[in-house]
Amino acid sequence: NGKILFKNQLYNELCFEPNDANVDTFLVYDVVIGVDFHWQRKENQTFKGTLRFVVEQDNIVLINTLPVEEYLLSVISSEMSATSSISLLKAHAVISRSWLFAQIQQVCSSQAETLSIEGNMMIKWYDHHNHLLFDVCADDHCQRYQGVAKVTTNQVQKAIEETYGEVLVYQNNLCDARFSKCCGGVTEEYATCWENSQVAYLQSIVDEKQKEKKLDLHTESAITSWIRSSPTVFCNTSDAHILSQILPHFDQETTDFFRWKKVYSQHELSTLVHKRSGIDFG
């Protein structure tokens, strides 16, 4: 009947709070990670904080509530590896903290429509519209948050403590510090990737030391040449030592992360467009 049965009682929601938030943990079995990615799998994960079970249609949603800095301990150890250098972990802490606060701020202030139709063109932006019951999800759609077992080194705690509360700010506004592990050698502008608006600090840049270098990738021939090349940029590395230090083990399984290939049949493309847009083009 759409309720949770617990100790012979029916509930719409259950909440379990720790007796000692510093020590008590709970274990969740078969958590799906990498949803819809090629490396999707299940993990048993251990968490701290409050656990809520909430009914949403035919599903039960598990929501973990905890302090931001505790959350970030897991994030910087799940997105990357806890064995990363202290400098990388500190930078990641500031970036992930900034991104989190920016998302919460946007949800609180935004009433923007995600779908617009202009002539024969339909534009739909996908972001945090799936998360109505909680601030952020625990997977790659937002930030990986895979529990306390990922925090395997003392330098993770040190990175959080030494950057406590630090965020990125641009012109007195909190930065939406979106990030990825690999950009393919050049980043995309915010307006053509996430939302139809300009963000001054999220512009297209080449992933190398020469900050003044510009790439014009606005033509078919230019982008084809770029994709088929193997430029000397930061994220184009096959150094096994570096990768084993900074990447979680399942990320290391993918060796062609810089240049990769995916083939779709006509039917698969049609199905994908229909699923995303709601329009059947045949």
Where are these regions (language model features)?
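Conserved, single-site charged/polar hotspot
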Residues: N1-G282
